[in-house]
């Protein structure tokens, strides 16, 4: 029986319907031979043999084009040029002379594999790859492919950022391999002796475990963002000296007739310059030189003709073959494959500290445009992509079957990704003035641009749409809300409703919007656009036509004078509520959207007094494009307004300020909307209340009915009816459609309308305010819910330890997830103060008990820092907006000096770059000082968050290093990788890390001889913990430079990265498949669940590509589930074995439970490692999610027995905590506990004890002595003291834990009883130890004086302590931790050891 049919599918989830025809299968691929690379040379130089056949795993829905991409990206097929696929002939005589297989016709590229192999047995599915003639596009693509492979990971100056998609996981986990790699080259790139490499390998193999010499939290500085061994860019082998298009291009006409396509110029490592002809039949070395043109082949076989340029170069240049084999077999790619996979479907992460790469000459870099387009003149340029048509065509792809949904999601995600990348590249060009505006006569903020079929405009109020709402400030918010609205509707995926590709880019202080172009957006509207579509949708459409063609409408159409009448808008308000249009088709589509978003159908009156029925906001427009599609625009006000903020906080009180707010503290805009998450949370809360009330009413009615029945039965002499009992057994069911709660999106909204009598010929009205309408009242109730329930509940959860924020970004994301707008940061900060304790949930606060203040204090600092950060962004945005490009770096560095470098230099001076064309004498940024900046920040915080910063915040509470990191990350600043001194005195020399100056010794103390190994190891550990090491040689090689006077200099600013907000939707198919697997496992069907999980992982990879944040999260979740299931499977097998032993039965492997091949710790570790790498490359090296991935990896590595790797990951966790928040964060206690537990499992009890002490001290600092969190740490610390043999201290610490457990949990709690039993055991052990010591002392007294000195080494407490400390003497070397504890306890009370083991298991 098919296992799929054994468990019902989860509701709304299609993934469990596994179709056997859609399951992956293998095909055999036969690749062409490579005659220029003999097999002997291939093996000697490390290039892989061409396998025959090559087995490739594919899915049935893939096309041959997908297979082509897979082959060309593989190590086996990278070298192929132009090729096609052929099937072998199916006839019996298909084998020709020489045993060669006769091949059939070419298989079409876009054919799906299931069609190609329909009816073919799985073991007979094969394809042959054969060469075909090149065309010019094939030749150009092949050359580009060669360049990409030869450049490897070299820095690309054309990228939008430096060190894009950098991963350091391999450097974290394998530092010794990176040290050996560095030891192979000296500073000049020459190879060192083999002895030096062997010495380095030998020294690295003898390294002690990380963190074993714990002496407190390691010293970490910003430069530790990138591990020491990875700070110098890797030097990959150079294969050619030069590769470029020859100056003989393009081929003359008579050569084109002979098949010539391109001419290449190659400088080999042997020093020879050759010219290569690319022809329709491949490549060959020709007779040309720099001064003579002769494209004919070289004679006597010296042309090295080949269908592959790779093979030609391998055959011609032995040094190319040798270097390319080293590049091909890069050990980093083999250890961490995901670090080398190109990022295709997501924007890569750019670290805020980047390495300053040496710029190398590359002639082909500037010729890349020709390789990509083939154009040599303007008229030959290909037409730009029609982004809108691509997006809409992808959305219209069929989605009835699983394979169709998968294909549709793949295509959509790829197009959205390419659209986002194109916009991120185009907007800096527009901002720099490189593109002519469509309306150059308008003011700058109103200008529009079209670049690469992208419609680009500024996110400012250039056309005076929002003067009554706050002008540019309101427009800035509106475009961000519009992107959110587009993303929401993209996720809803309503059929027939088209959405523009939309992204917002913040660049150099300005906000820009890029959209796909609507067909016919600027054409004049005619009568045909008013007619309903003749597609037979509904009778409703037909009824709409007469209304549109009324005489009044015709007259208005013929006498158009208003621009509002000359648009393509057919539904909604044209510009506000004055002109509103109706369209039945759009009304029906918007109804589907409104149902999901809980919006109400409402009436809006236009300027003529006519009422129109709308589902969405009147600002949301329906537009009929020239392509016949229905587009929706302007989704900024998809959610209702926050009326409480408008009424109470626009000019409301400022918390913490004794004075009343002045005009300067006016909130900058009135575009204050509720978040969709809040509406969903509030709707769910009200639905639960309604359901409980309904059930309670039914119970009351039922009880009354039963009472009447009982009374009637008693009157009839005790006769009893059974009907009430039957009804009582029926399950209670509620019809959710009876619950009505919707919101009016136009409630309390202010509109600007024309008024000839007003001073500015306009006035502001609020037409919809009648709260007797339930949908309008619901808007106020949701606003009340936000302030009275959502925010206090959020802060209460923080106090209870249910949520902590690693940094400001994590705080903002969590607030948004709970429906809380960031403008409430000041309100959140107020609730964190002791004075507001009564506003929190007192029941939860009581349960949290003493110590909850520790969570709130750390959280409050994060909230205050986030307010300072957001104010800093606003100030910097205003400063940098009008700065010339030549002064951007100077402006940024001066701003940072005033913000976080004021303790180094209290009076930093601006360093503008003055040229004859620049005038910076009156630039605002040059006049900025730390004092004026602080005043601006305080004013911004007062204005935007209604909060007054404490007077001492900047001096005492500001975490400068963390603020620097977040300002850089959130504004796109990339600084040079070096240590930045933010407090104290500056050093005389910089610690810059670049290709020429590494900032640390290339081979550290670990590679020296054993004689000085002790001192060198100590130095190496200090270096890894972040203490700066000087490099005398590198410093001497640098040119003399004046000492720094400030923390930052203009040269430190490497780049500004565009900050992108996209509208790409998630794939619901991938999420559904994964969720179906989790549901199946929770129901007990482990095999089906695991199969569905693997299918979900595969769907994630196919939709998003291998390197994407969603794939990282999927990998991490899958690794956690596999880890859990592997543990369960291991326990089941152990129980089976133990049961068989207890019954004296012989057990074989067949008798044990079958374990799925995927359920292994090695598999869990592998997926978690992939999750770490992908997270680093797409989210960031120091993103909070990356930190969590490292924490999970450390736990999995420990579970798999990889102690060194686990400790290396945990050291990285400590470094990341220092960078994100600092060491005084509640979650740092868990990080230290994990380190201590790993050391304890490695039997390093003294080191473990030191770490536990640090964790306990931190808990005391944060929570106090009476906190349950401190008591838990004390319990663990007591066990550590026990294992170290210090029973007296262990007893004292455990007594303190027992006291807190008893006070907080009560005497009957299991944790209290465990602590009490452990105290009793420790006390008994202490008495026994004292007795042994007394006996030893008495024996010592009875001995002759000459023998007393030598007899005290073996007895009493020393023996016991030694056994606990080293676990080496007295037969304890091979005992488990529990056995050692029982040994210390004298073998009594084994339950304590068992309980302790459970406690440790729970800590994992």
Swiss-Prot record:
Q: Where is the composition biased (Low complexity)?
A: 1021-1046, 1358-1372
Which cellular compartments is it found in? Cytoplasm
Q: Which GO terms describe its biological process?
A: intracellular distribution of mitochondria; mitochondrion organization
Question: Which keywords describe this protein according to UniProt?
Answer: Cytoplasm
Stretches assigned to the Clu domain = 357-646
* One GO CC term on file: cytoplasm
**Top-level taxonomic group:** Eukaryota
Q: What is its main location?
A: cytoplasm
User: Does the keyword Cell wall biogenesis/degradation feature in the UniProt annotation?
Assistant: no
Q: Where is the composition biased (Acidic residues)?
A: 528-540
Q: Which GO terms describe its molecular function?
A: mRNA binding
Stretch list, region Disordered: 528-561, 706-735, 996-1046, 1337-1372
| Database matches in Pfam families | CLU, CLU_N, eIF3_p135, TPR_10, TPR_12
State where composition is biased (Basic and acidic residues): 706-723
Family that this chain belongs to: Belongs to the CLU family.
Q: What does this protein do?
A: mRNA-binding protein involved in proper cytoplasmic distribution of mitochondria.
The record's note on quaternary structure and interaction partners says: May associate with the eukaryotic translation initiation factor 3 (eIF-3) complex.
Name this protein carries in UniProt: Clustered mitochondria protein homolog
């Amino acid at each position: 029986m098919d296992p799929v049919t054994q468990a019902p599918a989860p509701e709304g989830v299609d993934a469990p319907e596994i179709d056997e025809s859609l399951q992956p299968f293998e095909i055999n691929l036969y690749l062409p031979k490579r005659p220029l690379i003999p097999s002997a040379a291939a093996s000697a130089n490390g290039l892989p043999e061409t396998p025959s056949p090559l087995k490739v795993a594919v899915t049935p829905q893939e096309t041959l084009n997908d297979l082509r991409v897979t082959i060309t990206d593989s190590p086996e097929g990278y070298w192929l040029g132009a090729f096609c696929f052929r099937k072998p002939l199916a006839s019996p005589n298909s084998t020709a002379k020489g045993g060669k297989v006769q091949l059939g016709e070419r298989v079409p590229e876009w054919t799906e594999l299931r069609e190609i192999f329909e009816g073919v047995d799985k073991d007979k599915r094969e394809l042959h790859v054969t060469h075909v003639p090149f065309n010019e596009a094939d030749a150009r693509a092949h050359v580009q492919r060669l360049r990409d492979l030869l450049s490897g990971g070299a820095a690309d100056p054309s990228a939008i950022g430096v060190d894009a998609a950098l991963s350091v996981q391999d450097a974290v986990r394998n530092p010794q391999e990176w040290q050996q790699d560095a030891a192979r080259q000296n500073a000049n790139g020459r190879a060192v002796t083999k002895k030096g490499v062997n010495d380095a390998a030998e020294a690295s193999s003898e390294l002690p475990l990380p963190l074993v010499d714990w002496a407190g939290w390691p010293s970490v500085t910003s430069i530790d963002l990138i591990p020491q061994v990875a700070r110098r860019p890797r030097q990959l082998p150079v294969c050619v000296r030069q590769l470029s298009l020859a100056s003989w291009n393009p081929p003359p006409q008579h050569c084109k007739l002979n098949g010539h396509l391109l001419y290449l110029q190659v400088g080999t490592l042997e020093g020879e310059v050759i010219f290569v002809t690319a022809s329709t039949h491949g490549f060959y070395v020709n007779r040309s030189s720099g001064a003579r043109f002769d494209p004919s082949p070289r004679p006597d076989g010296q042309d090295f003709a080949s269908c592959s340029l790779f093979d030609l170069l391998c055959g011609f240049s032995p040094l190319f073959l040798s270097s390319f084999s080293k590049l091909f077999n890069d050990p980093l790619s083999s250890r961490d494959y995901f670090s080398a996979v190109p990022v295709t479907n997501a924007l890569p992460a750019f670290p805020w500290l980047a390495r300053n790469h040496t710029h190398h000459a590359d002639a082909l870099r500037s010729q890349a445009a020709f390789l990509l387009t083939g154009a040599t003149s303007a008229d030959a340029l290909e037409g730009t992509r029609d982004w809108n048509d691509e997006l809409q065509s992808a959305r219209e792809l069929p989605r009835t079957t699983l394979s169709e949904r998968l294909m549709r999601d793949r295509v959509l995600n790829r197009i959205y990704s390419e659209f986002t990348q194109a916009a991120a590249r185009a907007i800096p060009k527009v901002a720099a003035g490189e593109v002519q505006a469509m309306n150059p006569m308008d003011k700058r903020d109103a200008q529009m641009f079209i670049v690469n079929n992208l419609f680009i405009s500024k996110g400012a109020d250039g056309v005076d749409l929002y003067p009554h709402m706050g002008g540019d400030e309101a427009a800035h918010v509106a475009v961000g809300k519009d992107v959110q609205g587009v993303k929401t509707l993209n996720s809803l995926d309503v059929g027939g409703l088209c959405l523009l590709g939309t992204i917002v880019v913040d660049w150099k202080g300005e906000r820009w919007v890029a959209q796909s172009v609507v067909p016919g957006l600027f054409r004049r509207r005619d009568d045909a656009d008013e007619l309903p579509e003749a597609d037979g949708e509904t009778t409703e459409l037909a009824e709409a036509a007469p209304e549109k063609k009324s005489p009044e409408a015709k007259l208005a159409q013929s006498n158009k004078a208003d621009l509002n009448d000359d648009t393509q808008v057919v539904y909604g308000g044209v510009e506000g509520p004055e002109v509103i249009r109706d369209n039945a088709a759009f009304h029906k589509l918007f109804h589907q959207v409104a149902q999901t978003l809980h919006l109400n159908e409402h009436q809006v009156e236009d300027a003529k007094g006519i009422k129109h029925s709308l589902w969405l906001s009147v600002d949301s427009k329906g537009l009929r494009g020239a392509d016949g599609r229905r587009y929706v625009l302007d989704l900024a006000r998809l959610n209702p307004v926050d009326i409480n903020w408008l009424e109470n906080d626009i000019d409301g009180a400022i918390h913490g300020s004794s004075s009343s707010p002045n005009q300067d503290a006016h909130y900058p805009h009135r575009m204050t909307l509720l978040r969709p998450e809040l509406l969903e949370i509030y709707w769910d809360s009200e639905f639960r209340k309604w359901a409980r009330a309904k059930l309670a009413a039914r119970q009351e009615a039922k009880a009354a009915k039963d009472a009447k029945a009982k009374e009637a039965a008693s009157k009839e002499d005790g006769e009893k009816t059974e009907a009430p009992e039957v009804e009582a057994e029926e399950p209670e069911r509620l019809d959710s459609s009876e619950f009505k709660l919707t919101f009016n999106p136009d409630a309390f909204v202010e509109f600007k309308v024309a008024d000839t009598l007003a001073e500015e010929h306009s006035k502001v009205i609020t037409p919809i305010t009648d709260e007797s309408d339930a949908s309008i009242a619901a808007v106020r109730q949701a606003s009340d819910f936000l302030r009275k329930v959502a925010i206090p509940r959020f802060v209460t959860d923080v106090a209870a330890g249910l949520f902590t924020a690693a940094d400001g970004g994590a705080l903002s994301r969590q607030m948004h997830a709970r429906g809380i707008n960031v403008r409430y940061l000041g309100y959140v900060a107020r609730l964190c103060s002791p004075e507001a304790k009564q506003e929190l949930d007192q029941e939860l606060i009581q349960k949290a008990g003493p110590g909850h203040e520790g969570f709130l204090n750390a959280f409050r600092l994060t909230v205050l820092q986030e307010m300072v950060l957001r104010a800093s962004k606003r100030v910097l945005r205003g400063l940098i907006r009008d700065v010339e490009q030549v002064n951007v770096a100077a402006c940024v560095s001066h701003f940072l000096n005033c913000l976080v470098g004021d303790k180094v230099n209290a009076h930093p001076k601006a360093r503008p770059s003055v040229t004859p064309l620049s005038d910076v004498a009156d630039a605002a940024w040059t006049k900025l000082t730390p004092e004026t900046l602080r005043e601006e920040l305080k004013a911004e915080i007062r204005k935007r968050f209604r909060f007054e910063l404490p007077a001492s915040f900047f001096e005492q509470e500001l975490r400068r290093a963390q603020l620097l990191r977040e300002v850089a990350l959130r504004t796109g600043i990339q600084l040079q990788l070096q240590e930045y001194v933010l407090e104290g005195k500056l050093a005389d020399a910089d610690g810059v890390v670049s290709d020429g100056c590494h900032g640390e010794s290339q081979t550290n103390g670990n590679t020296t001889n054993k004689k000085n190994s002790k001192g060198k190891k100590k130095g190496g550990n200090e270096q890894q913990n972040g203490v700066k090491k000087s490099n005398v040689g590198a410093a001497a090689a640098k040119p003399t430079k004046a000492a720094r006077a400030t923390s930052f200099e203009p040269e430190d600013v490497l780049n500004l990265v565009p900050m992108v907000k996209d509208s790409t939707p998630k794939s619901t198919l991938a999420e559904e498949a994964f969720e179906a697997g989790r549901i199946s496992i929770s129901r007990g069907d482990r095999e089906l669940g695991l199969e569905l999980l693997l299918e979900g992982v595969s769907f994630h990879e196919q939709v998003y590509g291998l390197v994407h944040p969603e794939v990282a999260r999927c990998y991490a979740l899958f690794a956690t589930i596999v880890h859990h299931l592997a543990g369960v499977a291991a326990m089941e097998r152990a129980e089976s074995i133990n049961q068989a032993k207890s019954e004296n039965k012989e057990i074989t492997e067949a008798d044990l439970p079958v374990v799925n091949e995927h359920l292994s710790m090695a598999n869990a570790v592998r997926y978690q490692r992939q999750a770490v790498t992908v997270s680093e490359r797409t989210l960031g090296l120091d993103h909070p999610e990356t930190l969590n991935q490292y924490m999970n990896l450390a736990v999995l590595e420990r579970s798999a027995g990889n102690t060194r790797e686990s400790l290396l990951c945990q050291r990285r966790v400590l470094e990341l905590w220092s960078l994100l928040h600092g060491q005084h964060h509640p979650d740092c206690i868990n990080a230290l506990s994990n380190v201590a537990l790993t050391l304890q499992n490695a039997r390093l009890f003294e080191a473990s004890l030191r770490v536990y002490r640090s964790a306990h001290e931190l808990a005391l600092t944060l929570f106090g002595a009476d906190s349950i969190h401190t008591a838990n740490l004390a319990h663990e610390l007591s066990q550590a003291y026990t294992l170290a043999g210090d029973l007296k201290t262990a007893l004292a610490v455990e007594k303190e834990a027992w006291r807190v457990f008893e006070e907080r949990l009560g005497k009957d709690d299991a944790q209290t009883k465990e602590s009490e039993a452990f105290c009793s055991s420790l006390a008994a052990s202490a008495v026994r130890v004292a007795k042994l010591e007394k006996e030893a002392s008495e024996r010592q007294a009875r001995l002759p004086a000459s023998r007393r000195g030598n007899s005290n080494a073996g007895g009493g407490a020393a023996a016991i302590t030694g056994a606990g400390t080293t676990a080496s003497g007295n037969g304890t070397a091979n005992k488990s931790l529990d056995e050692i504890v029982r040994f210390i306890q004298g073998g009594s009370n084994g339950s304590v050891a068992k309980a302790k083991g459970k406690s440790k298991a729970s800590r994992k």
